Amino acid sequence: MFRRRTRRGGADIHVADPTYDDWAILRDFEDLETGLAFRDQLRDAGIKAVLTSDWELDRFRRGDIALRVEAADYGDAEVLLSGLDDA
């Protein structure tokens, strides 16, 4: 199990980590920077979110990246990212 670390000590992406296999996939991304932006939006809203990949990213920080949330938070996360939240 591998993790790429942020400057703040948290994991940017969880690689080959089965811990999050039961979490719902909300979006897929090809580059880490875009994935981090979406993940951080969810975290700022109080939703637990992580980025996962089955394989290491390439040298350009690209790969098959999944944005995951806990199943109970899927609906709220989808509404937030879709811009449909009226509140």
Question: Where would I find each of the regions flagged by the language model?
Answer:
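Acidic/polar low-complexity segments and flexible, solvent-exposed patches
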Residues: 1-87
